[in-house]
Every structure is written in structure tokens, then in C-alpha cells.
């Protein structure tokens, strides 16, 4: 497999000091997404050559790198049009495929998640986790290595196994690999959870 896949699953190099400062500056220029606090780090938004936002018609060099769930194939949405809901309204679009929720649905939180939060790239489509009667914050992709580095592997993997989805994922979970973890943190109790998806 190493010959056919090369360094496909290698961890990216850490950002240099200048790159970190640049990313922080870019992040501060974005609207705040409570359920997706760093959409630049997760790849939901990218910085590139200036494009026209199809929602507001303004130029932006930071734009959505995924395609929203709608009839038209919409590209290059600016962060503001997602944050204020204008893009969702104009194109009858949603940015998240599915989410878990227990109890009575909260229409305001649903609106904020599905219509005003950038999604994330996954194998089978986003599945957003919830906790404490609210949606969790999406932090990015992880494998077992990253969970161990954070000191949360045992708890997070045990909680995931209790969901009775994929079983015994610890040996196979690789950041951005064919079996990948998607890390979330509760906005209230701060508990970490993962969702696992496979190609």
C-alpha cells in the first residue's frame, strides 16, 4: 500500500510562524461561525485569486471551497453571504447534509447550522453532532494518532463505539484517510466527540 499510496496519509507540515500569523489575520477578517470556529483550518474556506460571489456580487479572495446543497452548482460564495443567510435564501441552499438531535427541534439552531454555517468535506456528506441541546463545534479531521496526542483517544473512541456505528475503529482511523474521524466539541460541557466516515 505504501508504494501505491505514497505519502497520501502523511501529516501536513506544521505552519511556520509567518503562516500562522497570516491565517490568524484571515480568520479575524471572517464572520464568526459558532458551529465551525476555524473554517480556514478545516478547508471549508480557501484563500485564492479574487472571485465574484454569486450571492452578493462582491469580490472576495476568501470563498467557500465546497458546493452547497441546492439545485444549482454554486461556487465561490463569500463567507459573509453564508454567515448572514443571504446565500441560503437566494439559492434555497443548505450547507450541512444531516445532523443528530435529541428532543424537540430548535428552529433557530437548525437555521444557524444548516443555512448559516459552512459544512465540511467528508466521504459521505456532513453529519453534525449535538450535545447539551445544541449543535457542537466542528474542529476538523482526526485519526487515532491525533486523538492520542490530544489525550482524549480512550474517552472519544469508547463514546463512539457506544453509538454502534463502525466498530473497532481505533486501528484504522487515519486523519483524512479512507476511515476518517471528524472531531466535534460541545459548546457547553466542552466534551469531545467524533463521527467516523469511510470511503
Which residues does each PLM region occupy?
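Preference for intrinsically disordered or flexible, low-complexity segments
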Residues: 16-199
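Serine residues within intrinsically disordered or low-complexity segments
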Residues: 2-4
Amino acid at each position: 500500500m505504501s508504494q501505491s499510496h505514497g505519502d497520501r496519509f502523511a501529516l501536513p507540515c506544521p505552519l511556520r510562524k509567518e503562516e500562522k500569523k497570516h491565517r490568524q489575520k484571515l480568520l479575524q477578517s471572517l464572520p464568526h461561525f459558532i458551529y465551525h470556529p476555524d473554517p480556514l483550518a478545516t478547508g471549508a474556506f480557501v484563500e485564492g485569486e479574487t472571485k465574484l460571489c454569486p450571492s452578493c456580487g462582491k469580490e472576495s479572495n476568501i470563498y467557500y471551497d465546497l458546493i452547497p446543497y441546492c439545485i444549482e452548482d454554486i461556487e465561490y460564495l463569500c463567507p459573509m453571504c453564508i454567515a448572514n443567510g443571504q446565500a441560503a435564501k437566494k439559492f434555497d441552499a443548505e450547507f450541512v447534509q444531516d445532523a443528530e438531535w435529541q428532543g424537540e427541534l430548535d428552529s433557530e439552531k437548525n437555521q444557524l447550522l444548516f443555512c448559516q454555517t459552512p459544512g465540511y468535506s467528508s466521504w459521505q456528506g456532513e453529519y453534525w453532532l449535538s450535545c447539551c441541546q445544541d449543535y457542537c463545534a466542528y474542529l476538523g479531521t482526526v485519526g487515532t494518532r491525533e486523538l492520542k496526542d490530544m489525550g482524549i483517544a480512550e474517552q472519544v473512541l469508547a463514546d463512539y463505539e457506544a453509538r454502534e456505528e463502525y466498530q473497532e475503529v481505533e486501528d484504522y482511523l487515519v486523519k483524512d484517510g479512507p476511515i476518517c474521524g471528524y472531531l466535534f466539541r460541545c459548546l457547553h460541557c466542552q466534551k469531545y466527540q467524533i463521527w467516523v466516515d469511510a470511503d
